[in-house]
């Protein structure tokens, strides 16, 4: 009788152990996520700013960020980097937060992510504050996420794709950036 009971307990343990392991609380740490503050500066007049802003506000980043979108008008934009910087400097009072760092004007403000497109000049770029900076290969991936939509003149969709892709990299620990 004792042997039978021991076999039954052992069998029951073997049957239930996968369930116990599956239900056991994991020590894996959950990473907090943050929804961005968003501003849209549609200088080219190609966006549905309200709808785009609403979509971007639902993204989840690993750090608190201010997500700024800028469209640059004109077919003569030869250097988008310069155009975005010029806009940031000349429109400082028009933006929700300063885009250029007040402590060091050679850098973008901390917590800032800028997604920019010059539709008529076929230029796209993304820019990051020092504390949310990503590797250049990730910048390329973020920009590439929008290319097919931009080819179709889906500016809102392309910018949402860039935003979604940026959530994959922004705030990721440096040791994980290549993943």
List each language-model region with its residue ranges.
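A structural boundary signal for the start of the first folded domain, especially the loop/turn
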Residues: 1-114, 119-179
């Amino acid at each position: 009788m004792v042997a039978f009971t021991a076999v039954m307990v052992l069998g029951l343990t073997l049957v239930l152990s996968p369930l116990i392991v599956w239900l056991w609380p994991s020590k894996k740490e959950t990473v907090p996520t943050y929804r961005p503050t968003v501003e849209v500066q549609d200088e080219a007049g190609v966006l549905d700013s309200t709808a785009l802003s609403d979509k971007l506000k639902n993204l989840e980043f690993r750090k608190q960020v201010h997500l700024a979108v800028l469209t640059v008008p004109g077919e003569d934009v030869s250097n988008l980097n310069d155009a975005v910087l010029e806009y940031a400097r000349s429109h400082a009072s028009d933006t929700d937060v300063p885009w250029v760092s007040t402590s060091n004007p050679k850098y973008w403000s901390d917590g800032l992510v800028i997604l920019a497109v010059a539709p008529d000049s076929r230029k796209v770029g993304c820019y990051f504050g020092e504390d949310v900076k990503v590797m250049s290969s990730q910048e390329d991936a973020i920009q590439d996420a929008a290319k097919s939509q931009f080819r179709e003149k889906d500016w809102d969709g392309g910018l949402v794709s860039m935003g979604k892709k940026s959530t994959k990299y922004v705030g990721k620990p440096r040791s994980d950036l290549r993943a």
